[in-house]
Amino acid sequence: MRRAGYLHLYGLNLVFDRVGKGPPVLLVAEEASRWPEALPEGYAFYLLDLPGYGRTEGPRMAPEELAHLVAGFVVMMNLGAPWVLLRGLGLALGPHLEALGLRVLPAEGVEVAEVLSSKLSYGNIDLGGNL
């Protein structure tokens, strides 16, 4: 079940959905509805509505600004170092998020479960205490 919440950050009420329990995984696209598929169990997913999209009011921002907003969300929500899956507009944030020290994976055109399972099968994702 998706649970909606918001975080007041940089003068904006950033709206997000949270689904599940487990290690945190952040899903970033224009809005939470860009992730319609069923999400796998065993993770705590955070699905953001970026400013100017979905339920988050505010001006649309440049990718660099959005990356700082996403990084601020991670810090304020005390998520540690989650994997950030990107789709749509989120893909433009990838290089900026990496420059800020976040770990990103593209997820355009594939199911979240497929992205996570393919990376897990190659041992590229540490789901232990190092998230």
Label every model-predicted segment:
Residues 1-13:
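N-terminal cap/lid segment of alpha/beta-hydrolase-fold proteins
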Residues 2, 34, 65-72, 92, ...:
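Alpha-helical elements of Rossmann-like donor-binding domains used by nucleotide-donor carbohydrate transfer enzymes
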Residues 6, 45-47, 104:
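Conserved beta-strand scaffold positions in the cores of enzyme catalytic domains, especially
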Residues 10, 20-22, 78, 88:
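Short loop/turn positions at the edges of beta-strands in beta-sheet-rich folds
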Residues 12-57:
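Conserved HGGG/HGGXW glycine-rich cap/lid loop of the alpha/beta-hydrolase fold
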Residues 47-87:
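Active-site loop/oxyanion-hole signature of alpha/beta-hydrolase fold enzymes
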Residues 80-111:
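Conserved hydrolase catalytic core segment
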Residues 103-131:
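Helix-rich cap/lid subdomain of alpha/beta-hydrolase
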